[in-house]
Curated annotation (Swiss-Prot):
Signal peptide: none
Phosphothreonine modification, residue list: 717, 894, 951
Protein name as catalogued: Ubiquitin carboxyl-terminal hydrolase 36
GO MF annotation, one: cysteine-type deubiquitinase activity
Top-level taxon of origin: Eukaryota
Segments of skewed composition (Polar residues): 144-161, 856-868, 983-1001
Compartment annotation: Nucleus, Nucleolus
Organism: Drosophila virilis (Fruit fly)
Positions with biased composition (Low complexity): 132-143, 509-523, 633-651, 735-751, 785-816, 869-878, 1058-1076, 1178-1188, 1197-1214
Comp. bias (Basic and acidic residues): 1089-1098
Gene: Usp36
Biased segments, Acidic residues type: 666-685, 915-942
Homology family: Belongs to the peptidase C19 family.
A Pfam family of this chain: UCH
Amino acid sequence: MPVSLAVCETANVVNAALRESLGSGIGGGGGCVAAAASRSSAGSGSGSVAGVDEAKIGDVSGTDNLQSQIVANAKRVLLAKIEYEEVENYHESVLAKLKSKYIVIKPDNNNGAANCNYKTNGKAVGSNGHDNNTVNGGTVNGNRKQTVDSGQSNQNSSANPNELPKPKRVLYPRENIRIGWKQSERKWQVGAGMLNVGNTCYLNSTLQALFHIPALANWLVSETSHVENCNISESCGSGGCIICAMAKTLQTTQSNQSAVRPFLIYTKLRQICKHMVVGRQEDAHEFLRFLVEAMEKAYLMRFRNFKELDQLVKETTPISQIFGGYLRSEVRCLSCNHVSITFQHFQDLLLDIRKADTLEEAFDGYFSRERLEDMGYKCEGCKKKVSATKQFSLERAPITLCIQLKRFSMMGNKLTKQISFKPRIDLSRFAARSPTAAAQPLSYRLVSMVTHLGVSQHCGHYTAIGLTEAGSYYNFDDSYVKPIAMQSVCNTNAYIMFYELDVANSSSSSTINNNSSSSSNNSVAPKLNGLRLSNGAHSPAAATVAVAATATSTSASAVSPRFIGPQLPNGYANSNGHALGGAKTTIQFKTTPQKQLQQQQQQQNGLLMGANKFQESSQSKHSLAGTLHKGEAAPNANTNANANKSSCNNNITSQHQQQHILPISSDEDEDEDDSDDDDDDDDDDVKANTAPQLPSMPKMFEDSESVAQTAKLKPKTPLKSLVPYESASEEEQEQQQQQQQQQLLQTPQQLAANPRKRRSGSDSSESEEEAPPPLPSILRNGHAKTNGSVSNTSNSSHSKAKSASNASSANVNSSKQKTDAIDEIFKSLNNYKNKHRIAADDDEDGDGDGDGHGNEQVQTEQGTKKLNSASSASASKSNGWQSQNGKAPSSPKTPPSPAVIKSKTGIWQITRTNDDDDEEDEEEDDVEADADQEDDDDEVVVVEEPQVSVTPKNPKNPFAASKSAEANATIAGAKRQKLLNGSAKSAATTRPGNGYQSESVANGSAVSELLKQNHRGYGTSVLSWNGKPSELDKESFDLVCAKRIAGHGDTDVHSDVNSSSNNSSNINSNSNSNSNGNGKRKNSTLLAEAREQRKRDAEDEEENEMDRGRQRKVKSASVKSNNSTPGYNPFQEFENQKRWHSNKSGTFPRFYHQNNRPNFQQRNKFKFNRFGGGAKFQQQRALQRHLAAGGGFTRRQQQSTGQQQQQQQQQQQS
């Protein structure tokens, strides 16, 4: 057995040998070293002559004799009997001193300590992870005596390297930290402000944030004895003690009513950090870190041998106990799954906010598992570099959590994004998977914070926000102190945040957790300033129970959603956390005898649980307090069960008397054919809802979106409301689409029975001509109007009316009403496609073949015809409004259309017209009238009021005021339609496609072509068609005919002018007869006006027309205008021809022109003229304003180009 001997050092051994050999001859009177040596060798004490002679001889060999004497005496000392005591594990104790300076990474698998005699019994660990038990005589002031068996305590930690190592000495116990303002005996004030003495806002804000941390403030106030007897300033020089300066500054802010100067801290700035300069702006977080470090050093200087303390002991200072915590780092090898566990001490968490918008997201990113660089980690198990993953977790959470948001980069730039946070946070989901970590409270509340206003690290302004004892927050802006609301605090651009353990929440949760342990084991967990913590105990049994009781509840809360609000202890918990005897609203389902038995079993836990509707089953649902995972055993399961039964059974009767029951449809599949039977079943189940609900009341029986996802209900019929809602949310719109999709999937046979009718929009009844349907229903908000809905059954309207008041009447005649509802949907959609046309339609409506071709097109183009609701013509007139009697399903975002629409152009009334109103259609289409009666029944037309004259809008200025049609006096009550290229074409004429395939069907019209072109400019008026300018509506019909003669050279023009009122007429005019009747003089005047009009159109077209880059630009003038190639664009062709082959300022081509400035201005008119422009641009703007005000055209004499003159000569000759 190794023995430790109390052997002196070499110098002590030599001195002892000299004193023993020379001490006997000192009193003999010799005094010299040689004489003493000779006397010692001779053994004689006399001073005879013979002695002197011997002394002379001894001078020769004095050195050798002295050395031999020293060796002899040292040997005699070593051979002397020495008392000693045996020390166990001497070898291990020496190694333990070395191991205390390092962290064990890999556990020692082999039993190397098998030959050593040491104990491996576990000990109860306190809340700070330290061994509170004493070995030889107890503790003094929380510190262990030096007689503690260090080998045994260190070997206890080395036996389980996955646990946090314990220090050999605790400088300041964690239990002495007082959390919260209420733990102090004094009354805390709001605190005075601090004067800014020159760019010291960072210092003032940091001090204010620290002074409003209750744990730190209570500790600084408790250091009064140290402040009075501090001698650190004498030993350190002129620097002084930082802790004393902080304590004095805190007392000054509490005692003064006006702003104070923190000169005690400001004068020690160089002592806190050497590179900080007085009067220069510094970073608040950097100053905070150096200030906390200086306070730790000042506390360690109280101990004489503080330099010899190891790192674990230095981390037990009061500053580290308040701000310090430990992170558990787990690195897992992806090859051999070897896990390396290390522990890191931290005093603040630096969160990256580049990919986070909230504080919770930043925490998730910090504690998430990250992948190390490929082949960059050397595994201890594989002994090679492999890929690994790393993850942090909280092994020991600090009392005060300091969070810094990484808002600044290395270059000083600031990330000024808003990070939302809450005043209370819970970090239990980030706790490590260890009993000690799971047992600690991790509920925090915001106590103070530092904010930064500015765009850079080196500029801006710092302010602080602190929580006072009264529970309100105050803003500290240097010397200004003012209260701030909670909402403003959460919307602040925070930089540094301080969260402290919440005493109230922790005490309630710890009381719940300790209830069971105290009942079965008569032991009490240690108090933390009135707060009974469950993560530490003085006995091993109590610690074990506390850990077992709280670890399960914490893990259960991580899986199930945590309950918000105060919680009652076991035995007093009510169902769903409500107060005892309080009224609550629950939901009652249709029950069967089996379900009643199941509910009775579920109510034993105080929870009224539905059948897979709103709550989980009792087998998988975790209760709010005291629950355990599967496979885990509670230490007092019987006690908890009896407590829950007794508390819940006593209050079940009183609770059920105050419950308000709401009806809801059952999840059972009921196929009932009679509504009376259904109503009888509902009367039995629905007790509270005896009176029918009003139609305008919101339906309480409609399933919400979350319920519809979990419930397995088969929708019988769509819910219908008597009162349509004017608007709907996006969730309801999605729910409506889901219901329609479910209906389509559940009835494939019924839909496939008549696909032609369903796709063409015909009614479900076959006798369409004999029995026309009543007013159609308009689907809004997922409900269908019941007044006038199509149904083959006689009692369908009554059953639908009942469905608005009863929850279960929606199951009546499910198969029939499914088909009717689907037919109504497709019928209304198809009617909207076919019948809601513009009143100013092309000449097909007047021809005899128009209705027939329109009906054929519905059948031939079932899936290809698209709905163009955002066209330029329809947007200016209808603007999404629909008639109240129409079949079109209005958008859930738009209100129902009124009877009369008031616009800038007049009053527009939407009425219903039949084919009887159109006299010419009756004469020409007697055979086809009956077949097309259904298609033309609901046609929406625009009716002109007799008092207000309605004219089409000006294509150049849609918002211009209407001008009285003086030239149209000969055509009374008729509204002239825009001519397509100045001539009317038949229905069978093909149109150019503008990048699309040309339509060869008879339904193609000028309006449909305009609808196709409406993507150019996104709804702006189309000013040209087929490469030629369009005519104005304000000019007379004769002028239009003359312009057609001058511009297009058409000899025979058939113009169809359709009226939007009850009477319509067709006008066939011959341009040759009109021109001959008016005379040559009138014809020349009209030609001149037509030429100038075409010039103005050509000039204004380039400015008003926008090219979105959707069409390929073809710079070729040889392509004919009537080309029907799919890629041909007449608009772009005209634009290219005008841009490349014309010149606005002269008759010469652009490349022959000598002056380049006008061409430059013309090419860049959009770039420069919009913001100031030139004279030409101002003239054009003035003309547009003149036209918008209702005025006529001005006469502008402009020189025509060479191409225009040649074109005019050719037209005159023809």
